[in-house]
Every structure is written in C-alpha cells, then in structure tokens.
A protein has these predicted regions:
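Glycine-rich flavin
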Residues: 2-37, 53-60, 65-201, 234-238, ...
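Flexible, glycine-rich terminal cap/loop adjacent to redox cofactors
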Residues: 7-12, 42-44, 56-68, 73, ...
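Glycine-rich dinucleotide-binding loop and its adjacent helix/turn
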Residues: 18-27, 79, 172-227, 231, ...
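Beta1/beta-strand and adjacent pyrophosphate-binding region of the FAD-binding site
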Residues: 30-47, 201-211
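N-terminal Rossmann-like FAD-binding beta1-loop-alpha1 element of flavoenzymes
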Residues: 37-64, 214-223
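A Rossmann-like FAD-binding core segment of flavoenzymes
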Residues: 105-106, 142-145, 149-157, 163, ...
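FAD-site-proximal beta/loop scaffold in flavoenzymes
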Residues: 185-202, 289-364, 451-452, 467
Length: 508
C-alpha cells in the first residue's frame, strides 16, 4: 500500500484515505493565477478557512494556500481526534463507575483500543468534507496545495506560480515545541501530531507537560488501560488555571490511576531495551528509572513562521510568532495574521473570530480590535475546566479591582444527583458594580457552562441581571444563577436591612 504522506494519515486505512482525498488530495492540480486577488490566505487551518470562505462569500477574489492538510490542527491532530478518543475513555470510565449508581457490570471492563482509534478516524473522515479542497473550490476560491513564500510586499510564490494580492493573511498556525530535556533528541517520542496515529494501546506511557493536552491525554490513556506517568513542572497540574482548579483535576487524574511526578526540567531520558524509554529525575540519580513504552511530549507550541519569506514582505516576527497590532495587521499593512501564528489564545474558536476580524478590517476598512473579543477556553478533562477573562495570575495581581463570588458544585442539586460535586463556579465582577470581568468553572460540563458567562460579558449583561434569569430545575446552569444571588445579597447592607425590618414591623 502507498505510504501516507503525512503522519496523521497513518495508518492508511479506508478512513484516512477518505480524509486524504478531502483535505490533501494526491492528484490536485493547482489553478493558474488570473489577476490580482483581494485576499491571499496562507494556511488552511481554522483561521485560514474561515477567512477564505467568509471573504469569498462577500464577493472577494480569494486564493487559499496549504502545504500539508486542509483543516489544520483542529481537524487532523487536535480538537476532533482528541475529543473522539476522550469520548471512548469517558464511556469506559462510566462503565467502571456504574456500581455507584446501582448498576452492576459483571466481569472486567475491556477496552478495544484499536476499535476506539478506528472510530476516531471514521468520525474525523466524516467531518472532513467541510474542510475539503473541493468544497472551497466550489465556493469560488482558488485552492493551491504547496508551500508559499513571499517574494515581495504584495506577491507570493507557490508551486512556481506568482500570486499578486491587495491583502494577505498569514494563518500558518503552530506546531508542537520540544522542551530542552536531556536525551530528548535521542529517543523517539510522540506529540499531538503523531499520538492519534497509534493503533495499539501502550502498556506504559509517559506524558511530559501538565497543561491541557497533557492532562486530557493522561486521563484518557489511563481510562483506556495504560499505566500513565505524568511529568509536571514545579507549578503542578494546569498551572495557568486557578490553583484550586488544578488541585481538583490532579486528584481526579490520580483517581483514574495516573502517577504524577514533578520532575519538570530535571527529567533525563534514555533509550531502554525493547524500544522502551527510561525516565529519570536528575535530582535523584540513584532512584530507579520510570520505564515507559511511549513518551508523549505536550509542552508548549511554536509558531510556524520560517520558510515563508516574511523578511521579503517586510513582516516582523519573533519567538512568539508574527507581530501584529490590535487590528491584526503586521508591520506590512497589506498583510494580516490570525490564529496560533500570532496569538496567545491558541484555540480553534479564537482563530475563527480573529479571522472574522481580519475580514472586516482587511476588506472593508473596519477597525475591529482583537482586544474587543471575549475569548473563553476549556480543558476537557473529567471534570472540565473552563475560563474567560484575565488569567488566574492576572486576576490575583489585580485582586483589589474585583469582587468574586464562588458557588461550590456540592450546593447544586443536579451535580449532587449525578455524583459530580467536585468543582465550582467562580465569577469576578468589577468592584462596586455587577459587570462581569472573568469566570472560572470546574464542572462536568464547564465548557458549555462558560458560554453563558462569555455571552453575558459580550452583551454587557451584569451578574445581578443573571440572578433574575430562570433556569430549568435541576440543571448545572443553576450554579451561575446562584452566583448572581450571592452578588445581590451584597446589596443588602446593614442600613438597607434595617430599613426592611422597620418597614415589615410597620406593615405587620
């Protein structure tokens, strides 16, 4: 069988062949450029696809260039495959925990890892037509498959063809970064770009990094049957989230069988027998090594900025990616950037709305600002962790500016009934008002619940108003309304309470 051209396409079964035919067709013929483009998009991930489709839908002449697979990380090696595998792991955990609900399951729960991964590949392929080369061609877009390079301030070369543009968008995304660990270059390791090509469950897997990807995959592999060791930094689990959120997730990882070690940058790696990898903490060289069969490195992302001739176009860039202003313009005002290549908000939904900002600003002389976007995010562990607004560290450094209201999920009836009481809803408001500035949620469906808060922030709806919003009973959404009740109680000052008492005495 023909070898896959890109790692995410392994194994090259019927599902990945379908995926390839949609997002990286082998015999694609690039069009001939005809005149100047309103917009040339480099990168066919979320930001690039949204910008291309949206611009073409408004009548713009658009070119879309992708050097690997349309759909980018989200479809091929990120959101889509990870959530499919997480769903399988969640199902396995649900069966194991069935006894808590009075449901007896005879015998040991058996997981067919190969079948779970095939399910993922099938679902990914089923979703892929939405991001296909043919779909975007049918939208009137010139789709070029190949490597793009700027040759001047308003020209790009791809496949030996020169494209001239009025505006361009750099949406090349980011890739997995390699941390400076001793021995890492000498061992074979997985990243998010390769882990979903596994067909057999690793008996023992080590995961470096306790951010969202590391935590999601640690819990997933443990629930599917691997012996998992999670190597964290001294900052612990989910270090960018609230400390108590990280504590809750850490406890759940341990409950699922994950061993957590704070080796961090002190980790030293060495190839062992039979393809295994020996992991040691340099601080304790005499201690026995942790031996794993596979190693997943999930520490940070590096923007894709090299090899595009950015210097020729006058586009400044650095380790953090392409430099942009609040309107997402680069140092060449004809050229914009969106998505992971230029933003600290490395999420699919953030890339989507950054692309919409670019459409308004690049094609219609708009003045939409990146800083005006309300961008939530979520980590899909069990329970989930979601946040919107300034980070936990930023909030802590400005705590005098906010009032916070916390509702424990143990006080929410639906969470009690379903056994999901570990977690909380915490909402921050501007001191002296009910204007919502940020929120952290740890709950079964925190990724869904946070949308209520981000919608309120976008629409300018205050926490006091949310208190008057009726939720069906019993739902976990009541937790947000309860936070509103806490806010309203602060308005019952001793003076107001005294007036109420006097009134009630008088009207008795």
């Amino acid at each position: 069988m023909t070898e896959p051209r890109f790692e995410p396409l392994a194994p090259l079964d019927e599902h990945n062949l379908k995926l390839e035919s949609n997002v990286a067709p082998r015999h694609w013929k690039n069009p001939e450029p005809s005149g100047k483009y309103n917009l040339v998009v480099i990168g066919g991930g979320t930001a690039g696809l949204v910008a291309a489709a949206g611009s073409a839908g408004m009548g713009a002449k658009v070119a879309l260039i992708e050097r690997q697979m349309l759909g980018g990380d989200c479809l091929n090696v990120g959101c889509v495959p990870s959530k499919a595998v997480i769903a399988s792991a969640h199902a396995a955990a649900g069966v194991r925990d069935a006894g808590k609900f009075g449901v007896e399951v005879d015998g040991e729960v058996k997981v067919d890892f190969g079948a779970a991964m095939e399910r993922m590949r099938k679902l990914r392929a089923d979703i892929s037509p939405h991001d296909s080369a043919q779909r975007f061609t049918d939208l009137g877009i010139d789709v070029y498959l190949g490597s793009a390079s700027f040759t001047g301030p308003n020209t790009i070369e791809v496949d030996g063809k020169t494209l001239t543009f009025s505006k361009a968008l750099i949406a090349t995304g980011a890739r997995a970064a390699a941390p400076p660990l001793d021995g890492l270059d000498e061992v074979e390791y997985l990243t998010n770009e390769t882990v979903f090509s596994l067909t057999e469950l690793p008996p023992r897997i080590g995961i470096v990094g306790a951010g969202p990807i590391g935590c999601e995959m640690a819990q997933t592999f443990a629930r599917l049957g691997s012996e998992v060791t999670l190597f964290t930094s001294s900052s612990g689990v989910l270090p960018k989230e609230a400390p108590d959120a990280g504590t809750i997730i850490g406890a759940h990882l341990v409950h699922d069988g994950v061993t957590i070690l704070d080796s961090g940058s002190n980790l030293s790696l060495k190839s062992g027998g039979g393809g295994s990898i020996e992991c040691r903490d340099k601080r304790d060289p005499g201690a026995p090594a942790v031996v794993v069969d596979k190693l997943l490195v999930a520490v940070g992302r590096a923007p894709n900025v090299n090899g595009m001739g950015l210097e020729e176009a006058g586009v400044a860039f650095g380790k953090s990616g392409v430099e942009v202003n609040d309107y997402l313009q680069t140092t060449n005002k004809r050229i914009y950037a969106a998505g992971d290549v230029c933003s600290r908000f490395q999420f699919t939904h953030a890339a989507d709305f950054m692309a919409r900002t670019v459409i308004r600003n690049a094609l219609f002389k708009g003045r939409s600002k990146m800083s005006g976007l309300v961008i939530p995010w979520a980590t899909y562990t069990s329970p989930e962790v979601a946040h919107v607004g300034p980070t936990s560290k930023e909030l802590d450094s400005r705590k005098d500016e906010f009032d916070e209201f916390t509702v424990d999920m143990s006080s929410v009836d639906r969470a009690i009934l379903e056994g999901d009481t570990d977690g909380f809803v915490r909402i921050f408001v501007k001191k002296g008002s009910d204007k919502i500035e940020a929120a952290t949620i740890v709950a079964k469906n925190a990724g869904d619940l946070i949308s209520q808060v981000s919608q309120a922030m976008t629409a300018g709806i205050g926490l006091g108003t949310i208190a008057g919003t009726i939720s069906p009973y019993p739902t976990q959404g009541e937790s947000i309304r309860k936070a509103g009740d806490l806010y309203n109680r602060t308005k019952l000052t001793p003076f107001v309470a005294k007036l109420f008492r006097k009134w009630l005495e008088w009207t008795r």
